[in-house]
Amino acid sequence: MAEDGSPKIYSRPPRDSSKTPTEADIFFGADNTIPKSETTITSEGDHITSVNDCTADGDFSTTVNKLTPTKEKLKLEEDIEASLKSTTLPEKEITTPTETTNSKPKESITENFIPVKIGNISSPVGTVSLIDFSSNMAKEDILLATIDAEDKEVKPTTELSETQEDSSANDEDTSVPPDENTETDVSSSTSSDVPDDGAVQVTDSFSPESDVPPSTEKEVTTIPDNVAEDKVTKIDLIVSEDRPKTVTKLSDSEEEKFITVFELTNSAEKAKDNPEDPLTDEEPADGVNTWVEKDAANEAESHAVLLTAVESRYDFVVTASETNSVVVEEPHVDTKNSPEKDAAESVTNVTEEFPSVTSVVEQSGNKEDLSTNDSGIFKLLKEEPDELMM
């Protein structure tokens, strides 16, 4: 019973006598339309009253204000405050982490991101991925300051760490040196949370880039060294007979060299073993007689193509008068002996006009006497003429 004698009236049967209707019923209008029952029976007595007599249509909050006395209002206010506190306490528990997340979670974010950056900088490729710090631009300035150090000369770890600390101190306090007093700042937390080893890691990340160029230079320099050792030069063996002077000016130092694809066979070893044996008309087969058939064996020796192997490289030593014989090679294969005689005469004329050529030919003839034009052809076939033609 209330103080004025009026019974308590509830819109629905009470769950507990001590509890009041919930907040949603009062403030949020969950039960704006009250179920209009004819009678309600209270728990305090057998009084039967009509709800329509004392309850007006409208919000339940107005009816509560009309029906509840002062003690009930006090209980309601206390319960509402308690319920509001119970609802606001998780909000405070949520807001206090959000207030702390403004400092500590950001610190944890920077603690998580900065090792990622150092890992990206320490990659051998040298690519740096910047993470977008939209909340604080000072972090990008710190990262750019560390990246700009890449363009400068690479210094030792101690010097680079000192220069980074000096540049960060001069940068309008954008990067604060690690202090324990400045843990609240997000920008200071980035610098305070990062240990001093971060500078060492950054310098270690830049040091491979300084090591990369000498390694690449070594790779580049080895290629021209291999080419320079070979000394590959190209000449045309076919020279017109009208201009023999261009060929006869060759000397020992001017002998043209170029690499051949084939390998030297046993005939070259025979040439080295027997350098003084002249090549006569009886040794080669009939098909090769067109190349060798001349008045004197000295002419065949002097006008031969010499194949020499110097330091495991195969060289053609092209003498002065041999180039004229190369020009005459094609008609000699199928024609008669008349062009051979003309070629021999032209060769002898050249040797008589330029006696220096004979000295060159004699010096080269001392190396290999048996390696003539026919032997050169069979060396290309990697077979000896005796095995084929005899």
Curated annotation (Swiss-Prot):
GO CC, any one term: motile cilium
Molecular function terms, GO-annotated: calcium ion binding
Region Disordered, annotated ranges: 1-23, 82-109, 146-225, 330-390
Domain of life: Eukaryota
Biased composition (Low complexity): 184-193
Biased composition range(s): Acidic residues: 162-174
Amino acid composition bias (Polar residues), ranges on this chain: 346-364
Record-listed Phosphoserine modification sites: 251, 267, 312, 346, 356, 371, 375
Tissue specificity annotation: Expressed in seminiferous tubules of the testis in step 10 spermatids (stage X), subsequently increasing to reach maximal levels of step 18 elongated spermatids (stage VI) (at protein level). Strongly expressed in testis. Weakly expressed in olfactory epithelium. Expressed in spermatids of seminiferous tubules at steps 4-14 (stages IV to XIV of the seminiferous epithelium classification).
Coiled coil regions in record: none
Keywords recorded for this protein, A-Z: Calcium, Cell projection, Cilium, Cytoplasm, Cytoplasmic vesicle, Flagellum, Membrane, Mitochondrion, Mitochondrion inner membrane, Phosphoprotein
Biased composition (Basic and acidic residues): 330-344
Localization of this protein: Cytoplasm; Mitochondrion inner membrane; Cell projection, Cilium, Flagellum; Cytoplasmic vesicle, Secretory vesicle, Acrosome
TM segment ranges: none
One GO BP annotation of this record: flagellated sperm motility
Chief subcellular location: cytoplasm
Residues where Phosphothreonine is found: 280
Function of the protein: Calcium-binding protein. Essential for maintaining the structural integrity of the sperm flagella.
Protein's name according to its UniProt entry: Calcium-binding and spermatid-specific protein 1
Species annotation: Rattus norvegicus (Rat)
Phylogenetic placement of the source organism: Eukaryota, Metazoa, Chordata, Craniata, Vertebrata
